[in-house]
């Protein structure tokens, strides 16, 4: 008997040919079930915000300060200070953020997991996190990895003489990788022009991506596809930083400020570097990129393959970056690893060596550094910063704070004693509650007033959904709080049907004014609250029409933001290109509509059952954009019935595509051939996809009406309150 046949288990659960292998285009619902309690080791009642409030932040920072200059033999500190390494670690933790879908960023501590922990741009950051383990171990659950990575970057800056803008905790850890689209390439650092390239046309970067190559945070420091052209590189810099919410001034400040510290590493050829952490052997214990070049560390370190130290004070804040940038002419050269970089012509040796105090080097720069001089717009900003060091320091402090906090959402989530007092426009500020809130009696009276206006169930539900469904669980932006649906740009979005929306808002504002004017104790209802309350009234009326009495939960406390408190450009990225819940597609896309529905559901933090019940309910409530009849599988719209599911699953109906793109379908009576319904891919997927059909069967059963209403109300209430961090 062979050794193989002696083993009772030749294969284990999860191995073998998968459904994805057989049907690569099958709709993937797994993204809706990430980060559940099943992967979370914390106790069910663990509250990270409360745990962080108990943390002695000053003590943690003191330990981090000590760590900065406590060099370890197993991974020595450049210049005797880990500051540069930890700035890079924090930057790369936050720098995956992108505005298009709000994904990436520092929240969750995703740098610990694949693929980020093994990206070529993150070489050696495995060592940075391992250096932090004794401190994380010491403070345990009271500080997450996500918060610690950013705090360490701040302390690194402070330990090198820089005054930061502030720090906020509140990033709870996740315990498994996010399922994020990072690109279609199959090779790390694959150049543009390949079969899976993220570029089309004249270097047009695919949305929602915000990096130029697979495995990079932003740009290739050698230039586009390794071409050492600073002007061409400026195009890539501007594109990628803009997609991370940074303007030109913030971009210059971040590059110059970050490159004031530390160095890059390219002591020898990349062929000496071993596999990344996810591919390394068990004995490496989660570390990767083991190098056989010399000692493999210290002066022999290979990270990016570039060997650049920008300033004469790499462990101290200074204006040296700009001084060197503008004081010298630059000559193209190569690092010991063969990477393109630049050296100052006719310059003296003024740059210290990281490990030999007797050695000095000429100033060096990256291709992307020189972009700050040779791109006209960047050059103008760079010279201003060079001539005004205090302005540069302030710009870097603010840009660094934005970089490291952009994905945290509103200030209500900020924790700790170092939260800056200043409110910033990119935080989507909302005024604090400054009046008594409505009570249960007021809620009941306002619902009656709303229903008496003559606004339909469809109008009430559509408006509330449009207001709340801008929320993104990725970066915690959007939502009903602030009532920004009445402001530019949201009021003008096609999906919100501007003319119809304006009429509904005008009516609700009349109800709001009448109520507020009648109060004698200062009590008020905000329009943000009233929009949600009106939606609740519509849902309750629709349930009543179905013969079921139910109360939709409601918690007052939302406030109305002003146009001045709204960054129109930053808010524009929240405009949905698709909203399957309203059967809306802005344009034709390569991605199927049903996949865009799942993507939207994931951003709304919905599960597959929640997504299913919401689609079925919103269809019969008439929430489709443009009053489209696609998917309205009922003869009693405005009634919260399970008709969508019952009629979709009816075998008396035969479906056929009626559009060339197979995106619109007719359902005909099998016996008579008469058209009964029309639907989109988003509608029919609930009968076609085996998992979604199983869910549809639950809600389409004869005994499901009450459960359907109850589940719809629960999912509806969840969406209405996604941005209510004040209730947590």
Swiss-Prot record:
**Cross-link named Tryptophyl-tyrosyl-methioninium (Trp-Tyr) (with M-244), where?**
91-218
- Annotated EC: 1.11.1.21
Q: Cofactor note, please?
A: Binds 1 heme b (iron(II)-protoporphyrin IX) group per dimer.
Q: Which GO terms describe its cellular component?
A: cytosol
Q: Which reaction is this enzyme known to catalyze? A: H2O2 + AH2 = A + 2 H2O; 2 H2O2 = O2 + 2 H2O
Q: Where is this cross-link: Tryptophyl-tyrosyl-methioninium (Tyr-Met) (with W-91)?
A: 218-244
Q: Which family, according to the similarity comment?
A: Belongs to the peroxidase family. Peroxidase/catalase subfamily.
| General function of this protein | Bifunctional enzyme with both catalase and broad-spectrum peroxidase activity.
**Name of the protein in question:** Catalase-peroxidase 1
User: From what organism does this protein derive?
Assistant: Burkholderia orbicola (strain MC0-3)
């Amino acid at each position: 008997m062979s050794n193989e046949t002696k083993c009772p288990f030749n294969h284990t659960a999860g191995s073998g040919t998968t459904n994805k292998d057989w049907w690569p285009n099958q709709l993937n619902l797994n993204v809706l079930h990430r980060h559940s309690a099943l992967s979370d080791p914390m106790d069910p009642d663990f509250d990270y915000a409360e745990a962080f409030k108990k943390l002695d932040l000053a003590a943690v920072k003191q330990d981090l300060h000590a760590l900065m200059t406590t060099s370890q033999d197993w991974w020595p500190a450049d210049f005797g200070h880990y500051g540069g390494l930890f700035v890079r670690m924090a930057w790369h933790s936050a720098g995956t953020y992108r505005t298009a879908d709000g994904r990436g960023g520092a929240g969750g501590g995703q740098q610990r997991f694949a693929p980020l922990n093994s990206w070529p741009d993150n070489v050696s950051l495995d060592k940075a996190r391992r250096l932090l383990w004794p401190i994380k171990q010491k403070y345990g659950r009271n500080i997450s990895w996500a918060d610690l990575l950013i705090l360490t970057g701040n302390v690194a800056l402070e330990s090198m003489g820089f005054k930061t803008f502030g720090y906020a905790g509140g990033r709870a850890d996740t315990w498994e990788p996010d399922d994020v689209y990072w690109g279609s390439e199959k090779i790390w650092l694959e150049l543009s022009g390949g079969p899976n390239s993220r570029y089309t046309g004249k270097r047009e970067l695919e949305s929602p991506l915000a990096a130029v190559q697979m495995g990079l945070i932003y740009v290739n420091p050698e230039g586009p596809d390794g071409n050492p052209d600073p002007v061409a590189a400026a195009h890539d810099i501007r594109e990628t930083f803009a997609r991370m919410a940074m303007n030109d001034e913030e971009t210059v400040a971040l590059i110059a400020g970050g490159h004031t510290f530390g160095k890059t590493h390219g002591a020898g050829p990349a062929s000496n570097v071993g596999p990344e952490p996810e591919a390394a052997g068990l004995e490496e214990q989660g570390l990767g990129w083991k190098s056989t070049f010399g000692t493999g560390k210290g002066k022999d370190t290979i990270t990016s393959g570039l060997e650049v130290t920008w300033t004469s004070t790499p462990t101290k804040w200074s204006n040296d970056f700009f001084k060197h940038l503008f004081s010298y002419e630059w000559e193209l050269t190569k690092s010991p690893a063969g990477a393109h970089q630049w050296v100052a012509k006719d310059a003296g040796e003024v740059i210290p060596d990281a490990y030999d105090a007797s050695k000095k080097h000429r100033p060096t720069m990256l291709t992307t550094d020189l972009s700050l001089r040779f791109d006209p717009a960047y050059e103008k900003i760079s010279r201003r910063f060079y001539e005004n060091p205090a302005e540069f320091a302030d710009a870097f402090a603010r840009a660094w704070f934005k970089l490291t906090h952009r994905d945290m959402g509103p200030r209500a989530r900020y924790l700790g004693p170092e939260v800056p007092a200043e409110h910033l426009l990119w935080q989507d500020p909302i005024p604090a509650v400054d009046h008594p809130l409505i009570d249960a009696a007021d809620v009941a009276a306002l619902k009656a007033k709303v229903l008496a206006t003559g606004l339909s169930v469809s109008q009430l539900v559509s408006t509330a959904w449009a207001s709340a469904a801008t929320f993104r669980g990725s970066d915690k932006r959007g939502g009903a709080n602030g009532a920004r649906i009445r402001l530019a740009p949201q009021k003008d979005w096609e999906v919100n049907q501007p003319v119809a929306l304006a009429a509904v808002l005008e009516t609700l504002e009349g109800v709001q004014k009448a109520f507020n004017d009648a109060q004698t104790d200062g009590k008020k209802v905000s329009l943000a609250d009233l929009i949600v309350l009106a939606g609740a009234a519509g849902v309750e009326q629709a349930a009543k029409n179905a013969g079921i009495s139910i109360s939709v939960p409601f918690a007052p406390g939302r406030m109305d933001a002003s146009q001045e408190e709204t960054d129109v450009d930053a808010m524009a990225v929240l405009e949905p290109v698709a909203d399957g819940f309203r059967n809306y597609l802005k344009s034709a896309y390569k991605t199927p509509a049903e996949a865009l529905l799942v993507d939207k559901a994931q951003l709304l933090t919905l599960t597959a059952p929640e997504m299913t019940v919401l689609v079925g309910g919103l269809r019969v409530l008439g929430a489709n954009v443009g009053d489209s009849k696609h998917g309205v599988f009922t003869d009693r719209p405005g009634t919260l019935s399970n008709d969508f599911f019952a009629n979709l699953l009816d075998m008396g109906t035969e479906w056929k595509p009626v559009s060339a793109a197979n995106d619109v379908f007719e359902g005909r009576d099998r016996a008579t051939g008469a058209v009964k319904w029309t639907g989109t891919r988003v509608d029919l997927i609930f009968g076609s996809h085996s998992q979604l059909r199983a869910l549809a069967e639950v809600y389409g059963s004869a005994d499901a009406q009450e459960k359907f209403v109850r589940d719809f109300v629960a999912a509806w209430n969840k969406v209405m309150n996604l941005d209510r961090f004040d209730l947590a």
